[in-house]
Amino acid sequence: PTTAAEKKNEWIQLFNGKDLSNWTVKIRGHEAGINHNDTFSVKDGVIHVSYDKYKNFDKTYGHIFYKTPFSHYLLRIEYRFLGDQAPGGEDWAFRNSGVMLHGQTPQSMSVDQDFPNSIEVQFLGGKGKGKRKKSLITASFAVRPSTPRFNTDLDYEDEINEEARY
C-alpha cells in the first residue's frame, strides 16, 4: 500500500539515529532477532557492524532487516569500511557489505542460511593492491542455493565468477 509520505514523494527516515528498534538482526547460526555478540550497534547516530567480539568468524554472516517491506523506493546510504577482516573470514568477504533488496524476511530464513534470497547491491571496499585495488559497487541476483539462468549456456558456480568478484 502507498503511504501518505510516498504519495508526496517525501523521504521516509528508516534509521532513527538512536537504536535498532525498527530493525531485526539475523546472524547465521542464530534465530532471527538475536544480535549475537552485539554484531550490530548504534554509536554516535551511526549503525556499526563489528566482529570484534568474535574469536573466529566461522561464516557468521550478519544481516539487518527493516520492519516494513517496500516495493518502490530510492535509498540514500552512506557507508564506510573500518578495521581489518574478521579472524577466519573468507578472503572474498574482505570489506564486503551491501543492501539486500526485495528479499525474504529474516523469520523465513533457516538458522544456518548464509544469505537471504534477494537482489543485492554490494559494496566492496578496496584493498589498495591486487585484484581489487579500488572500491566498487555491484548488483547481483542472489538466490541460493540455486543459480538463476536466463537463456544461456554459461556454466558458473555462483552468480558471479571469481574474476568478477574483484
Predicted regions mapped to residue ranges:
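Carbohydrate-interacting regions of secretory-pathway proteins
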Residues: 1-166
